[in-house]
């Protein structure tokens, strides 16, 4: 994933619910990963988290740090081969890939993982 595309999935904890909604709308995947100024992963937020927050409080100006999941699932670069298993085990559709310093370097999506496996399987049949 190119850096420009990766940035559409990253947001800082100080940004508001409205800003998060705009980014989620733009990336069309229903999720954002919260990073600190060093781009280290510190949380995740989904469109469902935002919907539940709005039903509960109605506050669009709150910082996303108030409602983010502070323990998001992730894999390190060397563990990418296990990404599909992690997604299946935790019923998640997006999984950030971290380097050894905990910096987000890529995001894997469930549909893309299935496509890669399916295409790989087909090429073995030839």
Could you say what each language-model-derived stretch is?
Residues 5, 28-29, 124:
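A structure-centric signal for secondary-structure junctions around beta-strands
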Residues 49-64, 112-123:
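A short, polar/charged loop-to-alpha-helix boundary motif
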Residues 1-9, 60-72:
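Bateman (tandem CBS) regulatory domains
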Residues 44, 58-61, 77:
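Non-catalytic, surface-exposed connector residues within folded enzymatic/regulatory domains
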Residues 9-29, 35, 54, 73-92, ...:
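The conserved cystathionine-beta-synthase
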Residues 24-27, 32-49, 87, 95-112:
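A glycine-centered beta-loop-beta connector
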Residues 1, 100-101, 105-126:
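Phosphate/pyrophosphate-recognition segments in soluble nucleotide-handling domains
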């Amino acid at each position: 994933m190119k850096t420009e595309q990766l940035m559409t999935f990253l947001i800082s904890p100080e940004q508001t619910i409205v800003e998060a909604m705009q980014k989620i709308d733009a990336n069309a995947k229903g999720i954002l990963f919260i990073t600190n100024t060093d781009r280290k992963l510190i949380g995740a937020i989904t469109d469902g988290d935002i919907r539940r927050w709005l039903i509960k409080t109605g506050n669009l100006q709150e910082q996303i740090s108030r409602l983010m999941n502070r323990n998001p699932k992730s894999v390190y670069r060397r563990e990418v081969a296990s990404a599909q298993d992690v997604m299946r085990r935790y019923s998640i559709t997006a999984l950030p890939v971290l380097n050894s310093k905990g910096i987000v370097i890529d995001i894997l999506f469930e549909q893309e993982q299935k496509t890669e496996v399916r295409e790989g399987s087909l090429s073995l049949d030839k």
